[in-house]
Amino acid sequence: MAVLMQVFSHLDDISLWSASKVCKRWQQLVAECITNDQWNQFTFRRWPLFRPNYAVAEWAGVFANLVDSSPCLYCLHRSNVEEEGAWEPSNHWRNNRLCNEWRIFCTDPPEGIRATPLDRAWSHWQASITGPTSSPYEGGVFYLHVQIPHSYPIRPPSVRFATKIFHPNISRHGDIGLDCIQHNWSLALTIAKVLISVQSLLTDPFCAVAMEADVAEMYINKRARFNAVARNWTSKYAMNDIRRPC
């Protein structure tokens, strides 16, 4: 047991969560090794935009729910890892532009959208989109990972969902079929405008070119069934701000 406790003390947050899933004994050892305050810190390091609407008593459960809601554990693990050599303040145009964009997010964000950088190089951002009213995503808060290339704004950011969502234009992995970040990028576009375009997809899917053909077929031909499944996914994966851990 002492050896395991020593090993656990060197693991990162995702590895600790994975270890706790191995068996009940390991779950108990992780619980003894990691305090509630540490799980609180782990949660806000991974999800700085998370805002629970209740008094959290057990942060390990909140962390576990958020991890379970992620479509890709590997991507989650890498989402706020600063790239080696990334902190090079040489691209002043990029840095100034991103600084201005973040300032706007802080002072006058688009309705239902938030974003914040995760690293010093401004290469990894987390964003959140509130599910639009009267859509099957209403009531949900969906997290996204935004990766900014060193050549931004010449090249577009990479944007993917970090919360599972049932949608024709969003793959099971979280990839988004959005024209403005794939083929029609423009210097006039910003992170905020891209996220607004993503938000609009939640009310108006484009099924002619879908990331998930079976979901698009359901949306077109079995709308009631689609809405029911999308609402179920929203309730299960995108309401961690109100869903208490079991």
Feature locations, PLM:
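Active-site-proximal segments of catalytic enzyme domains
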Residues: 114-117, 157
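Short, charged/polar surface micro-motifs in flexible loops or helix N-caps
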Residues: 132-134, 148-154
